[in-house]
Every structure is written in structure tokens, then in C-alpha cells.
Amino acid sequence: MKVIDEKPEDEEEEKDSGSKCKTPSSCTKKRVREKEEDLPPICHGWLIVCEGNPTKMMNKEVKLPWHAGYCVFEPRQSTMSCYKQEYPFIAGRMLHRNRTVRMDGDRSAFARHWGLLPEHYPSPPITGPHTIARSYTRPPKDRLPTKERFFSISRIPSRLTKFSTVRGMSIEFFDAIHDETNSGGAQVGGESLDRRGWSGASTGNRTTLTASVHNNLMNGRMSSSSHNLSTRLSGSTQNLNQPTNAYGNLLSRPFRSNPLKRTKSVSKMEKSLAEANQHSLHRVDASNTPSRDSSLYAQPPARRHLSQPAREGSLRACRSHESLLSSAHSTHMIELNEDNRLHPVHPSIFEVPNCFRLASTYYSCRTPLERAKWMENLRKTMNPRRDQQRRTENSMLIWILEAKGLPAKRKYYCEMTLDKTLYAKTSSKARTDNVFWGENFEFMMLPKIDEVCVSLFRESDSKKKKDTLIGYVTIGIDQLSSRSPVERWYTVNTSHSDSGTSRIASALGGKSSSQESPSLRIKARWQSVHILPLRAYDNLLETLCYNYLPLCEQLEPVLNVRDKEDLATSLVRVMYKHNLAKEFLCDLIMKEVEKLDNDHLMFRGNTLATKAMESFMKLVADDYLDSTLSDFIKTVLQCEDSCEVDPQKLGNVSNSSLEKNRALLMRYVEVAWTKILNNVHQLPKNLRDVFSALRCRLEAQNREALADTLISSSIFLRFLCPAILSPSLFNLVSEYPSPTNARNLTLIAKTLQNLANFSKFGGKEPHMEFMNEFVDREWHRMKDFLLRISSESKSGPEKNADAIVDAGKELSLIATYLEEAWTPLLQEKNGNKHPLSNVKSVLSELAECKRRSDNGVFHSPMVQQPSSDYENSPQQHVVPRHENVPAYRSTPPTGQATVLGRSTNRPATHLLTSDDYVLSSAFQTPSLRPGGTRLSDETGTSSSRTSDKTTSSAEIRDDTDSDFELREDRGRGGRNRKRLPRTDASPSSSQQASSGYLSNNPSRSSYSNSSSSSPVERMAALSIANPVFGPGPSSGYAIPAEPKEIVYQKRASPPPYDPDVHNYHYQPMQVYAVPPDCQVSPRTQATGGVNAQNRLSLPRTNPRASRNSTLLRPSVVNVPDDWDRTSDYWRDRGENNYRSQLESQVESQAREIERLMRENIELKSKMMSSTKTVDSKRSDSGASEDSYDSLSSLDRPSRQSLVVVPN
């Protein structure tokens, strides 16, 4: 129906543009493509994959089966698949039909990063399919023909030394890399595939080796951790005279001894069909058994290998002997529409960098940016409504600084657990005076936690399996929820039992109780950011984009250094997200340059401009910094030689030792400077554009001499030299350097900074004057370097650096910072005509939105899920506003009342139990209804006897058929849904019917405890002196006599609406006028009387709702037979008639509302003039407590004082 309605509009647009859809299907496909543009692109690339489900580290090196896999993430299918090879069929299909993003660059970049570049070796000995090739003599590769060369990995790569086992990659992977390398990357063809149904099968030698073969052979554990090697040759089996042929014959298994028998082959037609369908993957079936090749792939028990068809699949299982022996091409596939966990993994857990976890599989990327891209696209698919809903992002920053009170025995380390889940560990450090770590850890995408536990361990000797637990420190999360990090000493807790005390005492070397107990110095901060829907920040974003310069000028004097850094970081990220980073930085920096008196003090102070530039370089140039200085820093830290050249710090040393240190320092500085010069092409274009704009602005002001100083202060003083001085703060290394290495890095950074400042050593540092020779020699190269990074590239277009920014989180942080800093003095200073005059109103609006449980302006549904995306579930149960009930559409704009058919004596099966439909038994007359007696006054107080499963708050009810069960029912397609009992309308029932809408109002009224008006309650509120919307019965039922008395309120109106008490905000429901051709039965003007009250209590289909109020049933009107509600009826009437009808309905509604308001004002004045009270009886006007609030024209009746006016 939606396609039919949109089709004429689309055709008109295409006619205007000169292009018309040839067929309706082409228009439909066009709309589908437009909708698919909102989905994340297809991401694919090589990753290091671990298919396991580890629980903890066990204080030892984790041994998991890491291997290289070609991963494909398809957002349309919501799947994450992993393959052994990069198939041309998959790559070609994605490139031609979908938007794709290559995450790893290319195969050669992946291989170079992980040290998997191929080497040429002669053919290995012929072995069986389940044996391992050994090392042998390798003749020079120049003397071998191409077809006899053998590609393998001779050793574990340097970047994979922390992996316990790394699976081998196929020969085709290295063959393709070799071709790309030799041809300069011009060949982009696919890899040769095996003969199991894939086109382009290769001929010749095809071998897969294990990356850890050499390491396992050297350590004598070849058979325990090494994987199998499969060798297949094009010809028959040959025996080569090689030194390791004896091992191959010993370990090989002949074919006739294999217990698997070869069956008859399937027909050619079935075989071709199976090969054609081989590209499609089956879903994960948790009920099937693990793969037969579990020793090779270590599949978790809950996985089914994708080489086996699904239980209900259409493909037949392959029955050939060769297929059972060989492994499948695809290792696993994860469906993202299940309850999966996605979160980053700290590198200290598995000693694997840039790792993240999805379900029970771990993936390791090349760079942090690559991991951020993978996770961002996965999060968008798992939670597509993230920017349209309220959410909470939790993060934690913790520093493990040092420990004292420990004996000088072996090394110590700490493990950090959040709610008994291990997240990270420190390095092992030996005690000097104190055990100093100085390591910081940042955890993102955290769930809501209660406590942080830091456990202190001491490494044991090689004979023991486990390390010794010294003690632990437990910190409540409420102690860390502050604006700035909390730093203090924490006493290490030990066990209170006798055995525990003796164990701790023995671990501490038998210390007496009089000695100092161990303690840890920890600094930590817990941050929980509450984020509104993204469109709620439109006014704030507009203010920031148009008035960021006056805003920074006003906040500069009132912020401290820490606040400046936080605000500048968030501002830079928001401007980068909206492509305004260059203008923002240039305006801010030039404003500071204009105020600067001394050019030599450029970027020396801690201002918003310097902090913003520093944050921008960290955001876009993180990969550049890692590729430039990471290897150099690690080399310096591995060397224990000192570069100290100050004779006062060295003491009595010989001249030869001093000259040796000078030569080592000179060599280090030259290596660092050379790496910076050689990597100038990797500097991001975003940063070059900023430097180029700054140079152009200075040249326009005739201050060209200041350009080099400004640019060198930015790149060296704020980025490169601080990274050399403190590499752990820039994530170049994880450990804090030793005192000797820290001094070496300080001298290196000091020399490069003097070169960037174009100044020589002397005066206060005479011991560094020997480096003036280096400064003079590299002076002109520094000028050339600064000119190159601040000029447009002439080699061609360059790509901008990518960065993942959460705009909602940053805008929420900016709002928080402004609320703290925007004082009344600043608001008074910025008058009405000032550009910042609306800052206070914008902040007040956001504060009001955050304070309320929901906002009717944005109509953003709350999603019942964890506070962050740590546990994402795409099958989210959307809760409208703050109620814990499903959302349904309001009545369509036809003006008709819905009439139920014959009674089925049970709720409708297609409706949820929280729906607000009335059973047909409600329309029975009092004479026909069983037990039709009058409802007593105690009916309104029967809520004290309601079921425990009934709640009147907006909190999640775990003891009822909650939304989680509803999600399960929806996931099962509605099968096996639990039938809930109906309520009875008799007075003896302990549960009274209600509308099924919940309340946050703590005060329970006898009239209604609902704070969100239901459709029936709104109709009842409008029914006061309104014959159209009245809840009276239809013409087929008896009409009660006119009441003898009318109840009015005695005392004055209650206090006005207080949001602190009624912290709800409902969405006004649309009220449609009844068409004129519908026959509406007459009704009475009042609701008093025995029979009237008896008919007003209606049985509902919602047993969970509160039952302490009586409600009026909706009006029942006679719908003519010729009233057609189908789409054909509206289509035939024409657009003009339909529009005129809508306008008439709106006008009639407006007139009806105005009339109701006038009558309600008159009724209010009469109620205020009455003086008599009612002792025992009360009357229900049909309007709920919330209906009075919604109309804003009626006052709540009093529970205690009511007056009666005689007729």
C-alpha cells in the first residue's frame, strides 16, 4: 500500500526531471536503493580471528587458535562471515551491486603489517594430509623454476609473537600478494581456488603451512599446538629425496587405511547444482554438533560448521570422501539479529593489539582506526535507532600508579575486574623503593557496573602453575562519579580467615602485623553520559556552529586547564563531524595570535586554541604518529644503554664513556629525525589543510616570518615531542619507561624541539652544545619540512584521515560543560542583542528534556535495553514514552468508531495482553450480565488487594510477562505464546479493571492512578456535555433515568502541575470527528445511578494493568454498510475531496474543543460555588485523573469533600 501511494508522486517528480520510470518495478527498486543508502556499507577485509570463548586469563599466557581470515560484514543480511580465502565471486558480487569499504587496505598491506610476506623455498617433501612439514635445506631461490617455488612462513612474525598459535594461510594468498608486489598493485584479480565448486582453480603446487611451525619445532611441542598441513599436488604422489621424507612417511596415513569409505558420486546435474549454490552460507545452528575438524579450528560447542547444511536447509550434504577430509572454505558466520555482545578488548588480556569481541569470536585489526570502523558499522546495524532514542554511554579511565609495603621478591602486577569480569592487567614490575607502574587504562562501551576490583598478584617461580594473590582493592563506582579523577591510596584487603591470613603472610615474606600493610595508589574516573535524541541538540548545534568564536572568548577566562581541555576536545570532535574543523581551528588560533605580544611564546600557554589544536592532531593523525615513532620508541625502550651527557649527573666517569653516550644520543636523534622526514607523505590531508590555511592568513597579514614558528609549535611542541617524551600517553607503548629510558627520551625530544624552534644550545645547558652541529646541519631541512606540510600536495588528490565521532555524546558533554561554566554573570554580560543571548534558554531546554522521563516534542521512544551498546539486541522492544506497554497506532483518520464482532470469550490472539480493547461482553445489559449488582464505594479502594504482579510505576517489572518475554514471543513468530486469564467485572473480583496505562505519580487517587491518559480516558474527558464523544450506550440498550443529584467539588483547585511530582509527559492523542452520516445514539448528561455505574465497569483484556478505578466504555455507533474503509474508496474519491474532508474535520474538531472549554469553565465556576458535602456516595464523571491535566481546564475532584446540589 505504501508503494501505491508513493508511486504517483515519484512519477510526477520523474516527469519534471525529464526521466520517467519505464515500469513500476523500476520505481520500486529505486526507492529500495534510496532506503538502502541509510544502511552501513559492506565492510570486508583480512583480520586476525580467534574462534573461541575464553573466560579468564588464569594468570598465564592465553593460548588461543588465532588465524587469518577474510571477514565480510553484510548489513542487509545482518551477518558477519569469515572465510579462509578471498574469493573472487564474493568480492565481485559486492563491488558491482553494493556500497563496499575495504577495511585492511589490501592483502599486501595486511601481510606487511603482520609480517606475513612470502619467501621463496623449494618444494617440500611429499606428506600425507594430516602431517606437518619440517624445515630442510633451502637452496637459493634464483636457481629454482617458478613452478617449483614454495611459499610459506619460516617463522612466527614479529607482530604475532604474542599469539600462541597462528593458523597458516593458503598458498594462493601469498601468491596473490607476490603478484601484486611485483606488478605494483596493478593486478587486482582474485586468488586461485580449490576444486570444490569454485571457478578458476589453480594448477600446480598448493600448500598451506602453519605460521608457528618453526617456533613449535624449536620448542619441542610440535604435536600439541601446531595445526595440520594439507598438501595437494596436480600429479600423482611422488617421493622426493629430502632429509625430512622419513618424517613424512612416518606421519602420513594411507588412503586405504582411512575408515571413511568413498561413496558413489552424485549425478552431474546434482553436483553442478550444489556447486552453483556453494556460495551461499547457512545460518548458525546451535543445536548441531561441532565440526569434525574441531582440532584444527577449535570451534565452540554452540557452533555448527558451515560446511554442513542447516537442519531445515535445501542443500544436500556433500558425501564425497575428499570433501569430508578437507576443511570448509568458510569458518563461521554470526547473525547480528541475535543477542550478541560487541565491545573492545584491551590488548593486555590476550597480548593482541586492536582487538574486539563479537559474540564469542575475537577479531584483531591492524590499527585502532580500523577497529573503530568495524565496531561503528556493527553498532549501526545492531542498533539502527541509536541516534533517535535516549541512551547512556558509560566509560571509565583508571591509572594504576604504584604500590608500597611489598617485599622485594620477584615481580608484581595488577588485574582490573569490573563486576567480576576481567578487563585488563598491568605489566610485571620489580620493586625498587616502591613498585611503580604508572599505566592508564580506558574502557569504553561499558554496561552499568557497581564496583571496581584491583587484584594484586606476585609472579611465582617456574615450578608453580599459578601466581600468588597478595590482596585486592574494591572501589564502589559511586566514589568515582566525579567531574575530575579521584586519586588516593587504598589499603589492600586480605582474607579474614585463618588460612587466608597465613597465606597472605607467607606471600609477604612472613611480615609481622606491626609492619606497614600493602597499599595501592589508584586514580580513576567513572563517566556516565546521558544522551538525548540527536535532534534535541539542534539549537545547541546551531549556536556552536555560528557563534563558536565569541563563545570561546567568553569562556576562556573562567575555565581552568582541565576544563579547557575537555571543552576543546568535544568542540573539535563536533566541528570535525560537521566539516567545520578547519575554520574553527584557524579562527581560534588567529584570534590568539592577534593577542600575542611575544612571538617566541607561541603555543606555550594552555589556552582553548592550543588544547583544540592538540586534540585535533590526536584525532586525525593517530595513525601517522604510530607509523612514524612507534618502532623507534620501542627500540629505545629495549636498549638499556644510557644517553646521559651531563657530567654532574654521571659523576666520576671517564671521557670515553661520555663520548660513547654522546655518540648514542646523536644516533638516536638522527634516526628519529629521519623517520619524521621520510613519513611526511603520511601526514593526513586534514592537518595539512589547517596548516596551509594558517600560512595563507599570516601571509595576508604580512607576517610570513611567523608562519614557520606557528606551524612548528603546533606539530612539534604539541604533538611529536610530547609523544617522544611520554609515549604511554599517546598509546605508543603500554608500559611506563624506566628512569634511564625516560631520560634518554627526554634528551631526544629536547634536541628535536630546539631544531623546530631554530635555536641552539648554550647558556643553561652547556653539556648539550655538541648537538649544535646537528641543529646547524638540519636547519634547512626543517624549513623544507614545515613548508611541505603547510602546502597543497602536487602529487594528486589525497584522502582525508577518517575518525569515528559520536556526535550525540559530544553534544551532551558540551551541554554539561556549559551548564557548569555559564554563570548568571556571563548571561547578564551577554545582553539581548548579543549572539550568545540564547545560550541560557538552550541549556534550560536541554535540562528540562533530561529531567523529564520523556519529551513530547521529540516523540522519542525509550528502548528497554542496557545503558550502553555493550549488549546490543536488534530485537528491541520499543516502549512508548515511559509506559512498559507496546506501542500501537491511533485510530486512522476515518472518523469511525471501531465495533467488535461476536464474542469469542477470549482475547484476540493477534493482540498483546497490554492492549486497551474492550471485550464484547461489556455491551451486555445489566439484566443479562451475571452478577449485575451495584458497585459499592469500596470499589475505588480495592487496589490494596490487587495482585503483586500489578505495578503502577514506570520501572521494568521483572516478575510479570515482561518485554523480554514479549521479544521472545516475537522472535518465535508468536508461537507458544502464554495465554493470560481475563478479568471478571463482578464486585467480588479482587482485581478491578483499568485502562492498562502506568503511572509515575506516587500519590494514588481513588479515581485513577493512571498518569498517562488512555484513549478511553481521553474520550471520557471530552464527554462532559458532549453528545458526540460521550460514553453513553447505543440505541439498542436501555437508557437509565436522569439522576436526582449532581456532584460538584467544594474546595478550590489543587496546586498547579508540578513536574517534580508528576514526572511524566504523555503524547497528545489525535481525536477525530465522527462523520455526519454515522448515526450516534443519544446519551444521558450524567453518569449517576445504579445501572449506569454497573455498565461503566468493563472487563479488559489486560490483566497486568492497575485496577483501582472505574472507567466509562467508549461510544458504540452504527456504521453504515456503504462506509468503505479500503484503499480503493479513498483512491476513487480524488485528492481534492480528500483534502476538503480533512480540512472540515480539523475545523469541526477546533469548534468542538472551543465549545468544551467554554462549558468546562462554566462547570468550574459552579463547582467552586457549592458548599455542601457528600457523606457516603460519590459519582464518577468518567474522566480520569490525567484527563483533567491534559485538558488544563478542569480540576481534580476531591476525595474527601464533595457537595450535592439537589435537583
Swiss-Prot record:
<feature type="compositionally biased region" description="Polar residues">
    <location>
        <begin position="862"/>
        <end position="876"/>
    </location>
</feature>
<feature type="region of interest" description="Disordered">
    <location>
        <begin position="923"/>
        <end position="1013"/>
    </location>
</feature>
<dbReference type="GO" id="GO:0005096">
    <property type="term" value="F:GTPase activator activity"/>
</dbReference>
<dbReference type="InterPro" id="IPR000008">
    <property type="entry name" value="C2_dom"/>
</dbReference>
<feature type="compositionally biased region" description="Low complexity">
    <location>
        <begin position="1181"/>
        <end position="1207"/>
    </location>
</feature>
<feature type="region of interest" description="Disordered">
    <location>
        <begin position="1086"/>
        <end position="1107"/>
    </location>
</feature>
<feature type="compositionally biased region" description="Low complexity">
    <location>
        <begin position="985"/>
        <end position="1013"/>
    </location>
</feature>
<feature type="domain" description="Ras-GAP">
    <location>
        <begin position="579"/>
        <end position="789"/>
    </location>
</feature>
<feature type="compositionally biased region" description="Polar residues">
    <location>
        <begin position="237"/>
        <end position="247"/>
    </location>
</feature>
<dbReference type="GO" id="GO:0005737">
    <property type="term" value="C:cytoplasm"/>
</dbReference>
<feature type="region of interest" description="Disordered">
    <location>
        <begin position="495"/>
        <end position="516"/>
    </location>
</feature>
<comment type="function">
    <text>GTPase-activating protein, which acts as a negative regulator for the member of the Ras family let-60. Probably decreases the signaling activity of Ras by stimulating its intrinsic GTPase activity, thereby lowering the levels of GTP-bound, active Ras. The different isoforms may play a distinct role in specific tissues.</text>
</comment>
<feature type="domain" description="PH">
    <location>
        <begin position="40"/>
        <end position="383"/>
    </location>
</feature>
<dbReference type="Pfam" id="PF25321">
    <property type="entry name" value="PH_RASGAP"/>
</dbReference>
<dbReference type="InterPro" id="IPR001849">
    <property type="entry name" value="PH_domain"/>
</dbReference>
<keyword id="KW-0343">GTPase activation</keyword>
<dbReference type="Pfam" id="PF00616">
    <property type="entry name" value="RasGAP"/>
</dbReference>
<feature type="region of interest" description="Disordered">
    <location>
        <begin position="856"/>
        <end position="903"/>
    </location>
</feature>
<feature type="region of interest" description="Disordered">
    <location>
        <begin position="1163"/>
        <end position="1207"/>
    </location>
</feature>
<feature type="compositionally biased region" description="Polar residues">
    <location>
        <begin position="495"/>
        <end position="504"/>
    </location>
</feature>
<feature type="region of interest" description="Disordered">
    <location>
        <begin position="1"/>
        <end position="29"/>
    </location>
</feature>
<dbReference type="GO" id="GO:0046580">
    <property type="term" value="P:negative regulation of Ras protein signal transduction"/>
</dbReference>
<feature type="compositionally biased region" description="Polar residues">
    <location>
        <begin position="891"/>
        <end position="903"/>
    </location>
</feature>
<dbReference type="InterPro" id="IPR039360">
    <property type="entry name" value="Ras_GTPase"/>
</dbReference>
<dbReference type="InterPro" id="IPR001936">
    <property type="entry name" value="RasGAP_dom"/>
</dbReference>
<dbReference type="InterPro" id="IPR035892">
    <property type="entry name" value="C2_domain_sf"/>
</dbReference>
<feature type="compositionally biased region" description="Polar residues">
    <location>
        <begin position="286"/>
        <end position="297"/>
    </location>
</feature>
<feature type="compositionally biased region" description="Low complexity">
    <location>
        <begin position="223"/>
        <end position="236"/>
    </location>
</feature>
<dbReference type="InterPro" id="IPR023152">
    <property type="entry name" value="RasGAP_CS"/>
</dbReference>
<dbReference type="Pfam" id="PF00168">
    <property type="entry name" value="C2"/>
</dbReference>
<feature type="site" description="Arginine finger; crucial for GTP hydrolysis by stabilizing the transition state">
    <location>
        <position position="604"/>
    </location>
</feature>
<keyword id="KW-0963">Cytoplasm</keyword>
<dbReference type="GO" id="GO:0007614">
    <property type="term" value="P:short-term memory"/>
</dbReference>
<dbReference type="GO" id="GO:0008306">
    <property type="term" value="P:associative learning"/>
</dbReference>
<feature type="domain" description="C2">
    <location>
        <begin position="374"/>
        <end position="490"/>
    </location>
</feature>
<dbReference type="GO" id="GO:0007616">
    <property type="term" value="P:long-term memory"/>
</dbReference>
<feature type="compositionally biased region" description="Low complexity">
    <location>
        <begin position="939"/>
        <end position="953"/>
    </location>
</feature>
<dbReference type="InterPro" id="IPR008936">
    <property type="entry name" value="Rho_GTPase_activation_prot"/>
</dbReference>
<feature type="compositionally biased region" description="Basic and acidic residues">
    <location>
        <begin position="955"/>
        <end position="972"/>
    </location>
</feature>
<feature type="region of interest" description="Disordered">
    <location>
        <begin position="221"/>
        <end position="316"/>
    </location>
</feature>
<protein>
    <recommendedName>
        <fullName>Ras GTPase-activating protein gap-2</fullName>
    </recommendedName>
</protein>
